[in-house]
């Protein structure tokens, strides 16, 4: 634990000519430093927008400072307010600094930071002291809200690992990239044209409002649910949802491919360690997690290395089983592929795994029993079999009710180690809030376990993290390394998190 704090103030050289300006404020002194001096600093480094300068520091020194607290990351990850995360891309540090420095000084600083004004060291001193004070306030708030331990033990070390990994870059196969770029426009246009003709819609990707306007007159209820929920979980009489989700996947992959220049032999994604209220990790610019599987072959290992891909099996279901302590759910998870067992119970056909998974997660996150049975019937299931199957989870139902009650009473819900979601309103929970409470606990726990796994993975010699997914990772290693060791790390971390209540499952899978 560091006993002192110093503020890093930087002016980024966006031309990448090596002319970044780095300053440290501490002990009432402003000092110009080099990247090498910065990484050798023993004090805790306080800054904002660390993602902008961290890759430059790593590129110059092949390491990062020992302890860095990005105060905007701390504020957003510990507030529990969903809109803080959602508005993050639209705001800068100026709003948060207003309570700690004169507004004119803040405005002047933002102009300096954005290279619209020359460096004024008096302004930097003022802002440095303001950031120190803001850091102390945020740390105190995080401790009071039981978020500090997670930030220091999980979020901060994971961020350092991911930033270092991303700064090392990922090699690109230019020939494959060229082929995919040439094909994607045609593929997207043909998929869009087919979708437009099939559903009599304009030749453009429909917005969420467009989707609501189409589906509501057909009887689909959007009260208390969002568009993604309806598309992913509510069965339809036609293939509208399936086709639209496929079109969206093509569009996302198209955006990723278009964001990578053909001249680029290596890409360096931007890391967002707290990319959602449940603390999911996202890579941006480019958003590699959005690459379609058949486009992933543009990513290649470095010379003499190979890729492996490990993912958790029935991750959410296992977490729900452990959290709820439902004996039926625990047994299903322990006995093999839970979703195949659900398919066998509902459809009497384990080959209907995909539909069974969709129905189970719809149930788990709060779909009403009547709608659930109708949905299963729409897939061809027997109503009585469906009703009887889901009646077995009595303890799980009681657990969900207890989660709802806790959210309503405490006005927030979180994991075993922070990451709370705060309520926006008051009074009885809405159906959407009930789903959000369960989702926050389950998905937040999933993120926590995943990040614990990454911390352990970093200790494995010879393994280089390349792309983290929600419940999987792409990593690079030598030919003589056994990648099953990584699967063991992931499975063991899940087992240990729940103190042996369940045995975690992770395995090697195809990345492409």
Regions found by a protein language model. Give the residues of each.
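Conserved "right-hand" nucleotidyltransferase catalytic core of DNA-directed polymerases
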Residues: 1-18, 126-289, 306, 449, ...
């Amino acid at each position: 634990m560091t006993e002192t704090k110093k503020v890093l103030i930087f002016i980024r050289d966006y031309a990448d000519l090596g002319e970044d300006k780095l300053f440290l404020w501490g002990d009432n002194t402003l000092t110009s430093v080099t990247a090498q001096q910065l990484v050798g600093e023993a004090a805790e480094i306080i800054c904002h927008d660390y993602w902008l300068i961290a890759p430059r520091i790593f590129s110059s020194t092949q390491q990062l400072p020992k302890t860095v607290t990005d105060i905007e990351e701390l504020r957003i990850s510990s507030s529990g307010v969903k809109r803080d995360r959602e508005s993050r891309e639209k705001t800068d540090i100026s709003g948060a600094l207003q309570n700690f420095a004169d507004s004119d000084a803040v405005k002047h600083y933002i102009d300096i930071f954005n290279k619209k004004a020359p460096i004024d060291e008096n302004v930097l001193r003022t802002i440095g002291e303001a950031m120190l004070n803001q850091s102390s306030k945020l740390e105190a708030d995080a401790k009071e809200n039981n978020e500090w331990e997670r930030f220091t033990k999980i979020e901060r070390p994971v961020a350092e690992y991911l930033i270092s990994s991303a700064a090392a870059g990922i090699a690109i196969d230019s020939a494959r990239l060229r082929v995919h770029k040439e094909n994607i426009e045609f593929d997207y246009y043909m998929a869009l044209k087919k979708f437009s003709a099939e559903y009599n819609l304009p030749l453009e990707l429909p917005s969420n409002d467009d989707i609501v306007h189409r589906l509501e007159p057909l009887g689909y209820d959007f009260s208390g649910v969002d568009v993604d929920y309806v598309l992913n979980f509510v069965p339809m009489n036609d293939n509208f949802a399936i086709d639209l989700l496929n079109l969206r996947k093509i569009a996302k992959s198209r955006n990723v491919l278009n964001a990578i220049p053909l001249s680029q032999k290596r890409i360096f994604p931007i890391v967002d360690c707290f990319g959602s209220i449940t603390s999911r990790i996202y890579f941006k610019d480019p958003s590699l997690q959005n690459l379609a599987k058949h486009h992933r072959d543009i990513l290649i290992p470095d010379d003499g290395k190979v890729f492996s891909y490990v993912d958790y099996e029935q991750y959410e279901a296992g977490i729900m089983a452990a959290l709820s302590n439902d004996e039926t759910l625990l047994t299903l998870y322990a006995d093999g592929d839970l979703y195949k067992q659900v398919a066998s119970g509902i459809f009497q056909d384990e080959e209907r795994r995909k539909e069974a998974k969709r129905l189970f997660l719809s149930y788990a996150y709060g779909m009403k029993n009547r709608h659930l049975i109708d949905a299963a019937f729409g897939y061809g299931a027997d109503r009585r079999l469906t009703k009887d199957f889901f009646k077995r989870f009595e303890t799980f139902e009681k657990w969900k009710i207890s989660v709802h009650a806790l959210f309503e009473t405490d006005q927030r819900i979180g994991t075993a180690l922070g990451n709370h979601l705060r309520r926006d309103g008051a009074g009885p929970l809405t159906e959407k809030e009930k789903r959000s409470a369960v989702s926050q606990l389950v998905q937040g726990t999933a993120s926590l376990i995943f990040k614990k796994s990454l911390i352990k993975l970093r200790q494995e010699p010879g393994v280089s993290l390349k792309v983290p997914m929600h419940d999987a990772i792409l990593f690079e290693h030598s030919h003589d390394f056994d990648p099953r060791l990584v699967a063991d790390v992931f499975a063991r971390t899940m087992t240990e998190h729940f103190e042996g209540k369940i045995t975690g499952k992770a395995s090697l899978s195809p990345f492409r």
